A protein has these predicted regions:
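Accessory beta-strand-rich segments of carbohydrate-active enzymes
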Residues: 1-137
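Activation corresponds to long, low-complexity, non-globular regions
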Residues: 101-203
Length: 203
């Protein structure tokens, strides 16, 4: 019932993740934690979250992506047969201090899961996003997740765990489409002098 004096989240993922606390996204850049082979190394991020916590219920929200661990388009390099291939796995620990008391927990089967509006994602092929599958308020403290599925314990990855001291991957420019074609697959046309990009849109 008391807001802690300090609170840290330590987090890594075999693919990519995005992190929200009480509906506020605090992810350390794009493609977090970083692109790596989870059989060799995994970078972990640490977040100071105490200013985002409040009295009563709080919510940690995660969105996971395939990254290197499930590179669907990597068959040219036999990534489809890689020993580390799997759905993205996450490891998270929370530690808060309030006076002389300490609260600690880790991500386990009490965390709950559901499919996201991202219906396809690949390290090299981008993602398909279906906005009709969005779930309002899913990362807020008052959301009812009783219909969601409990997380599954997946074991420990073999890669060495390293603190993430890499440069953040950030968005430097956003492009607006200049034309959209109707059809089964709707390519989006960007201005000239830009590498060709195709985006599948769902309404």
């Amino acid at each position: 019932d008391t807001v802690p004096d300090s609170a840290l989240i330590t987090l890594t993922c075999t693919g990519f993740y995005r992190l929200w606390i009480n509906s506020v996204e605090i992810t350390n850049g794009r493609l977090a934690p970083y692109i790596s082979n989870p059989d060799q190394m995994l970078f972990y991020d640490t977040y100071d979250v105490h200013t985002l916590l409040r009295q009563g219920k709080n919510c940690i929200g995660l969105l996971l992506g395939n990254g290197m661990s499930n590179a669907i388009g990597g068959f040219v390099w036999d990534f489809d047969k890689a020993s580390f291939r799997s759905s993205p796995q996450v490891a998270l620990s929370f530690e808060a201090v309030c006076g002389e008391k300490t609260l600690c927990f880790e991500a386990d089967e009490t965390f709950r899961c559901a499919p996201s509006p991202i219906i396809f994602d690949d390290l090299r092929s981008g993602e398909h996003y279906n906005a009709t599958l969005e779930i309002d308020g899913w990362n807020s403290p008052d959301f009812d997740d009783s219909a969601w599925t409990p997380a599954i314990f997946s074991g420990v990855t073999r890669g060495k765990k390293l603190p993430n001291d890499t440069d953040r991957v950030v968005i430097t420019k956003e492009l607006k489409a200049v034309k959209i074609y109707k059809g089964h697959v709707a390519p989006t046309v960007f201005p000239k002098k830009i590498s060709p990009v195709a985006v599948e849109l769902s309404k």
